[in-house]
Amino acid sequence: MDMFSLGQGNNTTTSLEPFGTGGNDTGLSNVTFSYQVITSLLLGTLIFCAVLGNACVVAAIALERSLQNVANYLIGSLAVTDLMVSVLVLPMAALYQVLNKWTLGQVTCDLFIALDVLCCTSSILHLCAIALDRYWAITDPIDYVNKRTPRRAAALISLTWLIGFLISIPPMLGWRTPEDRSNPNECTISKDHGYTIYSTFGAFYIPLLLMLVLYGRIFRAARFRIRKTVKKVEKKGAGTSFGTSSAPPPKKSLNGQPGSGDCRRSAENRAVGTPCANGAVRQGEDDATLEVIEVHRVGNSKGHLPLPSESGATSYVPACLERKNERTAEAKRKMALARERKTVKTLGIIMGTFILCWLPFFIVALVLPFCESSCHMPELLGAIINWLGYSNSLLNPVIYAYFNKDFQNAFKKIIKCKFCR
């Protein structure tokens, strides 16, 4: 986002001029042909990949019915926004970077800055809308099913564009300094201190704080739900083990594994005198009703395992079943840990990419206007920070769509032209 571009000013101090462009002939002002060729290739590749990636996401949602849901509508709107950044903003930004001076006039400059701020701010706020939708879905899944409507998604999308509009328009209405238009070779946004605070906090710092809070709560809720599921499984396993046995463990078969017949004999030996026939429920001598569970052999025959009666009669679960329950519980625990690690990894990628792309830019954008006379920003570093922010429009479709198996299947269909048939 070229909200606050960085570069060398007309004197030895640093100002917020785009991509290192300034009125003097230091640094990158006298660009070489090789610099222009290399920069054109790099930026052209970035723009092409951003356009292609976001266009594929939009096409996948439009053509694949299984992707047409509220969550993916937000991802599709994000792709449209990033596509607008790639088509409307990045070509002019690349031209400015390659030529190292603004050549399109003041009116085009104002339009360029307004589109830049509007689209990039909306892109960032779309990430907040997606985080908010996911937070509601995981913390209130039952009620939110009915609330998660296309109308709600449209309201969130409209809000992102409204906030972007409120941040991008003020400089065009006069919230700027006289120096902002003093050099026709430069295209800079307002360096007014009030607008700097207003725009940086509205476009980044407040959304960043909101995303950190939301994804933190999403992680806690997901971890709680995963561990709750594991506890239920463990309780179920414990619920089938109604007693412990002092009898020796069942004998092993020739292959070293507990035999099914041994399980049956172990159960029968312990259930002395318990009336039971053919898996049916029958009255005991003490007139208490017994619940019967069947333990099957590998073969066709089957034995019967009585459970405790209300009068306190004691029975036992074969050791082989207890070990099976333990193995099942252990497998569930491992699956839960894997899901928890995957959740941490996914949220880490989402937040890590967003912070890596935009935090350096907005730190400089907030600090430089207040220390213009004493701060120095190398021109090359300023250009890298600028384009690092722009690259977020390339990475968003990768993070939010290409890691999704449903999107992957849709992309394969697009590549194979199955939608054309």
Swiss-Prot record:
One Pfam family from the record: 7tm_1
Tissues in which the protein is found: Most abundantly expressed in midbrain, in dorsal raphe and hippocampus. Detected at lower levels in amygdala and brain cortex.
Activation and inhibition: G-protein coupled receptor activity is regulated by lipids: phosphatidylinositol 4-phosphate increases HTR1A-mediated activity. Plays a role in the regulation of dopamine and 5-hydroxytryptamine levels in the brain, and thereby affects neural activity, mood and behavior. Plays a role in the response to anxiogenic stimuli.
Chain sites annotated for binding serotonin: 116, 120
Gene Ontology biological process: adenylate cyclase-inhibiting serotonin receptor signaling pathway; behavioral fear response; exploration behavior; gamma-aminobutyric acid signaling pathway; regulation of behavior; regulation of dopamine metabolic process; regulation of hormone secretion; regulation of serotonin secretion
Topology in the lipid bilayer: Multi-pass membrane protein
PANTHER family on file: 5-HYDROXYTRYPTAMINE RECEPTOR 1A (PTHR24248:SF191), ADRENERGIC RECEPTOR-RELATED G-PROTEIN COUPLED RECEPTOR (PTHR24248)
Role noted for this protein: G-protein coupled receptor for 5-hydroxytryptamine (serotonin). Also functions as a receptor for various drugs and psychoactive substances. Ligand binding causes a conformation change that triggers signaling via guanine nucleotide-binding proteins (G proteins) and modulates the activity of downstream effectors, such as adenylate cyclase.
Name under which the protein is recorded: 5-hydroxytryptamine receptor 1A
UniProt source species: Mus musculus (Mouse)
Gene assigned in the entry: Htr1a
